[in-house]
Amino acid sequence: MTELFIDGAWVAGSGPVFASRNPGTDAIAWQGASASAADVERAVASARRAFAGWSALDFDARCEIVKRFAALLTERKEALAAAIGRETGKPLWEARTEVAAMAAKVAISIQAYHERTGEKRQDMADGVAVLRHRPHGVVAVFGPYNFPGHLPNGHIVPALIAGNTVVFKPSELAPGVARATVEVWHEAGLPAGVLNLVQGEKDTGIALANHRQIDGLFFTGSSDTGTLLHKQFGGRPEIVLALEMGGNNPLVIGAVEDIDAAVHHTIQSAFLSAGQRCTCARRIFVPQGAHGERFLARLVDVTSKITADVFDADPQPFMGAVISARAAAKLVDAQARLIEQGARPIIEMTQRDARLGFVNASIIDVTDVARLPDEEHFGPLAQIVRYARFDEAIERANDTAFGLSAGLLSDDAHAWEQFRRTIRAGIVNWNRPTNGASSAAPFGGTGRSGNHRPSAYYAADYCAYPMASVESTQLSLPASLSPGLHF
């Protein structure tokens, strides 16, 4: 089987065989050999050879290839959505939106290069000052499993537009989606070596991250893995390291007239994608008193009716399975540990089948947990924290090392002003779900949530470096010489 894409051709991997599974059925979704260290070496060497030609190619010519990629994505939307659903458990309705987002990033990325990078000129006394942007060279892109098409392309598209070449290491849990995406890139007309795919598990990732011939590493994934990468590159300032990681995101419920709207946005924040979005709300702050009780009762009522099913079920469910049976068991275990520390389950999470990734949307009151662990539970596990004062809610919301997203649901504009001034997060929403974001705005956080903004627009900032020039078309002796010089 040809699992890897190196130097413009599909080739067999020489590492251990691994497989991905449909988390809703346990059927094998993809199987093949991983990339060995030698395979990674060939992929990086291929990207290095291709860099000179690709970076020298006219910018508009590079953009035409990327635009063809977007057009092909639109043509193959259903097939790609099925691949995403089969491997991640994500319902088809949601997988279709992921493919659409992949295509939409292209136009924004091209616009971003012109507006944020590109070339700018300013006249000066003896010539002109010019700001240009140059690609870094060979960049490694590490993709996550939760959006295996959309999120890696948030790095790949702007990297290619800027003139870099890429070695792509997808999540070992979604290799089939990666292959399908790279096939589209190949058909779009990318020259050999410009994009290389290395499939594999931990050893493949280590071989790529440790390679001395990469100029940048762009990563979307867990904070633990991103932190290890950051430590690994300590003392190597020549490497451009862009990290987009997780969050322990707060959603604060304030004074609202429309309880159903607040409940809807809370469910979208906590349970969309089965809670497997880095921007999902993990901690929901609910006021004490009658208003909070009404909100919580309605939240429990609607949440209890949410079903999870296979990706292609008819009718479509709100949630699919989480990525694996192991991930489901880990969530149930996290709930058990919280209960041991004093939490009170309101809707208890259970794993439907030990072989599958199905868990129910769950709600647990952690108000009485003395030392609430600052962890990202990556799934539909909503933690309720009751608060007496709005200041207290903000203080506790900020009690995290993460800083990705935060939200306030409130009719009070003054409360919003206070919230946005004092909350510590990169994405802060008002009367919208915490996971609502635009590709034309910065996407990313602060603290343990990362150090760059890998949306289509702001990714341009780290995909090229600025080069400043002072230029004159005519070489001439200046009219005024420095003291001590005689001509």
From Swiss-Prot:
One of its GO terms (biological process) is arginine catabolic process to glutamate. The active site is at E244, C278. It catalyses: N-succinyl-L-glutamate 5-semialdehyde + NAD(+) + H2O = N-succinyl-L-glutamate + NADH + 2 H(+). SUPFAM superfamilies: ALDH-like (SSF53720). NAD(+) binds at G221, S222, S223, D224, T225, G226. Its EC number is 1.2.1.71. It is an enzyme of class 1 (oxidoreductase). Pfam families: Aldedh. It comes from the Bacteria. CDD domains: ALDH_SGSD_AstD (cd07095). Keywords: Arginine metabolism, NAD, Oxidoreductase. Belongs to the aldehyde dehydrogenase family. AstD subfamily. Catalyzes the NAD-dependent reduction of succinylglutamate semialdehyde into succinylglutamate. This is N-succinylglutamate 5-semialdehyde dehydrogenase. It comes from Burkholderia vietnamiensis (strain G4 / LMG 22486) (Burkholderia cepacia (strain R1808)).
